[in-house]
UniProtKB/Swiss-Prot annotation:
Name of the protein in its database record: Bis(5'-nucleosyl)-tetraphosphatase, symmetrical
Record keyword Hydrolase present: yes
InterPro entries per record: ApaH, Calcineurin-like_PHP_ApaH, Metallo-depent_PP-like
Keywords from the UniProt entry: Hydrolase
Gene that encodes the chain: apaH
Function text: Hydrolyzes diadenosine 5',5'''-P1,P4-tetraphosphate to yield ADP.
NCBIfam families: apaH (TIGR00668), PRK00166.1 (NF001204)
Species the sequence originates in: Haemophilus influenzae (strain 86-028NP)
Lineage: superkingdom: Bacteria
Amino acid sequence: MATYFVGDLQGCYDELQLLLERVNFNPTQDKLYLVGDLVARGDKSLECLRFVKSLGDSAQTVLGNHDLHLIATALGIKKVKPRDRVDAIFNAPDFDELIHWLRHQPLLVHNKKLNFLMVHAGISPDWNLETAKSCAAEVEQILQNGDFHYLIENMYSEQPDRWSPDLQGLARHRYIINAFTRMRFCYLDHRLDFACKSPLKYAPTELTPWFNLGNPLYKQIPIVFGHWASLVDEPTPKGVYALDTGCVWNNRMTMLRWEDKQIFTQSAVKNYSDF
């Protein structure tokens, strides 16, 4: 049995299949973890959703910002962006079933046995493990069982940009969603920055990657995440695994085998910017 993690798919189905073939992935024995953003901008988002869903307990994803945006468009809250290339999902006979399944995916996975945390973007520099898990569960409960339409409709805001345990209601839930699905750089006072998406060497000096802000949690448990394609080939601290290597931006898809930490990569098989 082997455990694999793969970076953001974003509709890049063919590259995923090539990687799974290379490692001889066997869903009856192995497990595949995905760091979120299964959809958007690649040409096979529908295939990605169907495939991951079809794996059942042999796969586990977390919600990314593009996944949440797909739910928002499914609810009619946002319009479909042509560049996201998700029309096939909306025309699919299993559309409702796929959105229902996606809505029931977590924001955070903590595997005690294998000793890892998996998120899409990151974990707030102000959270310990207990807070991170409780915050994730709080929003997941609403997405899966509560008034998720109201939450999705009101999640599009960059405020508040700083965590406080006193946050309540939508403000609290927006921060939780943004930390788990959108965070990259932070200010030294731990405020989230949403503007800078550049490689580290081009970032303003007042900004620091979230994983360099000294949260003890970052050293206690290995963290696997995606979201930040411009981190490709950038060093990260020990135990912090950045797996989004920009396949949909004509770079490559990255897979990590957990047991021996071996990396497998697959270059983009097509120029997605040509579509």
